[in-house]
Every structure is written in structure tokens, then in C-alpha cells.
């Protein structure tokens, strides 16, 4: 099993980051995400918790050696379940790939919370992903997991840049609304 962790600070209040999160994809930078469909959304805990289940469609090429295992497909699907908790001001998203889980399973958790030192203006982002290959041979299994981490890392960079652009766009809207 391989893992990937990343954390950032966004110079926006948690409420704004959480709002912008729903518009994060698709964007011009993260072109691998081609669709995000809401499957279910409901309020829990007397309206304090918003539960959302989404299907994320991704299109990207796989290396030739991987096509031996998965065929010539370039589409993948990810199930994401998120909770927004107004009481503790947290957004937690958990996702897992639905495509080819017998070859590579990716479990991701993302969490947005107010920064403890500046909770009114800064939001902490923490991302943790685990990669587990189901390929029976150790050498090939490690190659699959390493490829998964590398691809995920590359996409995470694009995701951060893309989300920064979404936040900047929303910031302009928020500023204009307050004028």
C-alpha cells in the first residue's frame, strides 16, 4: 500500500471555501474531471449536517503497460460522499474509485476546517489518499501503486491551481456583492 498526503491554507473563510467547493469541477485546469453529478443530497442531525453523494467522471489516458490490465478505456468513475457540519464547521469528503477496483483501489479523504489561529479568515485543507493494488504479483502491484500515486499527485497539483482560480472568481463576486 502507498499513500499521499497534502495540506494547504486558503486565505478565505471556511464558509466561502465550502461554498466554492461545490463549483470546483469541472474547471479549465483540471481537465481530467469531465462531470460531477449529484446522486443524493439530504439534511441530517436536525439540519446541521448536509450529506451529499456525487459521481465524478474522469477522462485521462493510461500508460500502455496499464492498458494490458484495463483495456483501451480512458474513463473512470469515482464515488464521493461528503458531509458539511455547521456545528463544528467542517467539510469532510471521502471518495473511492469505482472503475477497476480489482487492479487499483484509491481511498481519499479531504477535510476543510477553519484555521485554529485565524478561524475567521483562513481555512485548512488536508488530503490523505491510500492506494492498494489487487494485482497478484508484487513487482507489478508496486508498479501499479506507484503509478497511482504519481497520477494522483499530478492531478492534485492541477486541482489546487484550479480551485485557486475558482476561489479568486468567487472572491470577485463576493467583493462586488458587498459594494
Swiss-Prot record:
Q: Where is the PRELI/MSF1 domain?
A: 1-175
Membrane topology note: Peripheral membrane protein
Q: Which PROSITE patterns does the protein's record reference?
A: PRELI_MSF1
Q: What is its main location?
A: mitochondrion
Q: Which GO terms describe its biological process?
A: mitochondrion organization; phospholipid transport
On the tree of life, the source organism's domain of life is: Eukaryota
A single Gene Ontology MF term assigned here is:
phosphatidic acid transfer activity
Q: List the subcellular locations.
A: Mitochondrion inner membrane; Mitochondrion intermembrane space
Extract the InterPro entries matched here.
PRELI/MSF1_dom, Slowmo/Ups
One annotated Gene Ontology cellular component of this protein = mitochondrial inner membrane
The family database entries (Pfam families) matched by this protein are listed as: PRELI
Assigned keywords, A-Z: Membrane, Mitochondrion, Mitochondrion inner membrane
Outline the subunit composition: Interacts with MDM35.
The family classification in the record reads: Belongs to the slowmo family.
> What's the stated role of this polypeptide?
Required for mitochondrial morphology. With UPS1 and UPS2, controls phospholipid metabolism in the mitochondrial intermembrane space.
Further comment: Present with 672 molecules/cell in log phase SD medium.
Could you identify this protein by its name? Protein UPS3, mitochondrial
Q: Which species does the entry assign this protein to?
A: Saccharomyces cerevisiae (strain ATCC 204508 / S288c)
Amino acid at each position: 500500500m502507498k499513500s499521499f498526503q497534502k495540506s494547504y491554507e486558503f486565505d478565505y473563510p471556511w464558509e466561502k471555501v465550502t461554498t466554492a467547493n461545490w463549483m470546483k469541477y469541472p474547471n479549465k485546469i483540471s481537465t481530467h474531471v469531465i462531470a460531477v453529478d449529484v446522486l443524493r443530497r439530504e439534511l441530517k442531525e436536525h439540519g446541521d449536517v448536509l450529506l451529499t453523494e456525487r459521481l465524478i467522471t474522469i477522462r485521462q489516458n493510461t500508460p500502455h503497460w496499464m492498458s494490458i490490465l484495463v483495456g483501451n478505456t480512458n474513463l473512470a468513475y469515482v464515488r464521493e460522499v461528503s458531509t458539511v457540519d455547521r456545528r463544528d464547521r467542517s467539510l469532510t469528503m471521502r471518495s473511492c474509485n469505482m472503475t477497476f477496483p480489482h487492479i487499483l483501489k484509491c481511498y481519499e479523504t479531504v477535510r476543510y476546517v477553519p484555521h485554529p489561529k485565524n478561524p475567521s479568515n483562513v481555512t485548512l485543507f488536508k488530503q490523505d489518499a491510500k492506494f492498494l493494488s489487487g494485482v497478484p504479483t508484487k513487482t507489478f502491484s508496486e508498479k501499479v501503486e506507484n503509478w497511482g500515486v504519481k497520477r494522483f499527485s499530478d492531478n492534485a497539483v492541477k486541482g489546487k491551481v484550479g480551485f485557486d482560480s475558482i476561489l479568486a472568481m468567487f472572491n470577485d463576486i463576493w467583493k462586488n456583492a458587498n459594494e
